[in-house]
Structure formats: C-alpha cells, structure tokens
Amino acid sequence: MKHSKLKTGIMIVLSLFFLLSFGSCSSSNDSIGTDTPVNPKPSDVKVMDKSKIVDYNKYHCPAKWNEGFEKGAEYMLRSDARWSWWRMKQSEHFFVFWEPGFGDDPNAESVPEALRVDIDDLLQKAEQFYKTNVEKLGMATVGQGKSVLDNHKMQIYLLYQTEWLATGSGYDDKIGALWVNPSTCKPVGSTIGHEIGHSFQYQVSADKLFTGEATPIDRADGSQLVPAGFRYGFGENGAGGCAYWEQCAQWQSFQDYPNECFDQDTHYAVWLKNHHRHFNHEFMRYASYWFQYWLTEKHGIESYARIWKESKYPEDPLQTYMRIYCNNSLDALYKDLYAYSAHCADYDFKAVHQYKKEAAISYSTKLYKNDGYYQVAYTNCPGTTGFNLIPLNVPASGKVGATLEGLAPGSALAAADPGTVVDGDGNAKSTVTKYNSQGNTQ
C-alpha cells in the first residue's frame, strides 16, 4: 500500500469584487459612439400620433436623466429623435429601437453588411429567452400583480457602431433593458441570451420595489442602495461589484445553448486556473457557473430564482443559499460545497455532462515537498468556498492512501514556494511568505 502525506492549505481568502456596474458585460471602447444625424429641415420631420402606436402604454420611457432621453417621451414621436417610434419594432414582450444610421430597416441592403441586423430574428430569439427566464427559471412572476412585466415590455436598443457593445441591466428601477451593437446579433445567440439574462436579474429588484417588498436605502453620499436581487456590491456599505451577475447570465444563456458551457473554451480555461478561489471571485466572473448546475439538480430548477428573489442585503449568494437551504449552518454549507466540488471533477451534472470536453477536466494543483508532505502552493491555496482537485497516479494494482493535515490561516509556505501574488491576467504583483490569515468560522 503506497501511503503519501499531503498538507492542504485550508486558507481563507476574502474576495473583493470590482465590477464597475451591475450587468455591464463588455464594450471595446470606453466611450460609446452614438449615431447623431444631421439636423433635418423642420419640414422633413415627421411626428407620429401616439394613439396609433400599438401597445404604446406598455413602454416605460426612461427618465430624462438617462442618456438619449433628455427631451422626454414626446420627443420620441419625432422622426429625428435618437430613439424614435419611427425606427421601432415590437413583439409580445419586447420593444426594439435602432439609431438613425440604420434607416427604416437595419437589414436593408443599403446598410453596410457589418451593421445589418435581422430585427425579426432578434425579436424571435428574445421571446425564446423571455420564455426561458419566466416559464423555466421563474425570474419574474407574471400575471399575478407581482411584476412590472404585467404591464410593460422589456427594451432593446441597437446602436449604429462597429465597436462591440453588449450590456444588459435596466432603467429607473423599473424595467429590464439591453444595449447592443450589430456584432452581437450575427447571429443572435447566447450573447443576447446573456444580456437578456441580465435584464431579468435587474427585473428581480425592480419587481421587489414595485410590490413594496424592498425599499431603497439612502447612502451618505446621496445615492441609494437597492437591498434586493444583488443590486449591491460586497464591499463596505454595498460598495464594489457583484460577479454573480456575470456568472449567472452565463448560466442563464446556457439554458438555451447547453453545449456552450464547454464550447466557450476560454471560459473553462479560466475556470481551471481559478477554481481554488472564492466562488464569486472577480477573476472568473464569466467562468464560475458550475454551482448553479449543482444547485438546481439538488434542489430543483426553481431554486435558481429563489436565490435571486430571496436575497437580502448584505448577503452574498452563498450566504443566501446557506440561509434558505442549510438553516444557516456553516457546516452544512461546507458539506454541500464539498459535494459540489466533487461533481466538478468530471462535470457530473445531468444537464451538461454529455457535452464535456476532455480538456475541461485538466485540473491541476501546484504542490511543494515540505517535511515529508506535499504542501499546496500559495498560488493554488483554496479561498473561502474554493477547492483543490489533485489528480492521483493510481498503480495497476494495490491501494493508494493519503494523510491530510490542515494548516491554520497565516501558516508559513513551503520553503520552495515563491509565494507569488498575481493579478487577474496572471501577472506577478508581489510575493508573500505566509498564507493569508483571514479566518472564516462563522
């Protein structure tokens, strides 16, 4: 019987999150270019009769402090408005507006090919994503007076620019919305599903405000914090960002494109480098979506929306999970996290196991020999809710045993461990000689 001894760095790392804004996924430029038409002659401006606009009362016009809406709802009736009813199409649950550069039809041959968008396809796919989020996941409860969506449609804004833009959130604590450029719609797929996922995440808190289940909290700087649906960061007084938005928008989009949890290989590559970190760590905000598969397999698909809808400031998602499903027992939470991590070893999740790629199971943990043990390197030391997966070379016959010894927070690293501290891109920032000393026993 071969017997090896292994020191595991059971250390606790407090994760900080630095998303600039909830639901803001990506843009290739810092300032979003807008399509500003040449001022037409007054005689060329057309004004639409709002009484002839189907479902006009289902449109929430964003307040005047929002960019593009400074002149109010009436101005949108003009053909020269940036967002105009003359350049709009709608479906049962969505309005789509496009900028003037597209003309009357964003899919017309007169529009440069790189900027063409099939609006009918966009709306058709958006309706499918709506169905997924409402009927399958339960992110909004419609038809019972519990959601703004009973009386308003979500909003999509298409910008006339080649720079990549994909952002989902909402307006005025009331209605979900997304802003995209044509590249995200060629074809319409998981990117739009991801952004509509953000719109429904936003809708959770908007609906809580609508029903009175949540009340904004005034901050010292005059701003307000919405204490529901993770509309807050995990820093002091709700500062910072919430990587859970991105993790979940990924997972929500994969409900319609299940194979993409593996096909997007850049994400599982990031996961393999960072799974030892906190579940919500910013370094893997687009790649840490496996817990949601385990959660819904164990507790049912409705558990996903429960975490969102029943969250309470200042909880993070796992604290919400612990309260709902573990009777606030930290020991029970850790047992569940162990089960989750064990399933991650081979992606043993019924919903997606069939799509698994061998490259995605290339887990590794850097170890250093130290005093008769193998000690986990600082670069792979598990943070709170993170884990190590250490492959063993099993002989053809016989048994392999291991002795595990936990190390207290702040313990010394192995002598050969350089203690390299890295940033999100893997670049070295500094070095340490001890594991982090933050504890987590309550």
Language-model segments: what does each one mean?
Residues 2-11:
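Bacterial N-terminal signal peptides that target proteins for export
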Residues 25-33:
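Bacterial lipoprotein signal-peptidase II cleavage site
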Residues 269-335, 339-343:
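Active-site-proximal alpha-helical
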Residues 177-261:
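Zinc-dependent metallopeptidase catalytic helix centered on the HExxH motif
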Residues 314-442:
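Beta/coil-rich, acidic/histidine-enriched accessory regions frequently appended to metallopeptidases
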Residues 134-153, 208-214, 235-242, 262-268, ...:
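Surface-exposed patches in mature extracellular/periplasmic domains of secreted proteins
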Residues 20-24:
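C-terminal motif of bacterial Sec signal peptides marking the signal peptidase cleavage site
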Residues 39-175, 179-196, 200-212, 414-420:
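Zn2+-dependent metallopeptidase catalytic core
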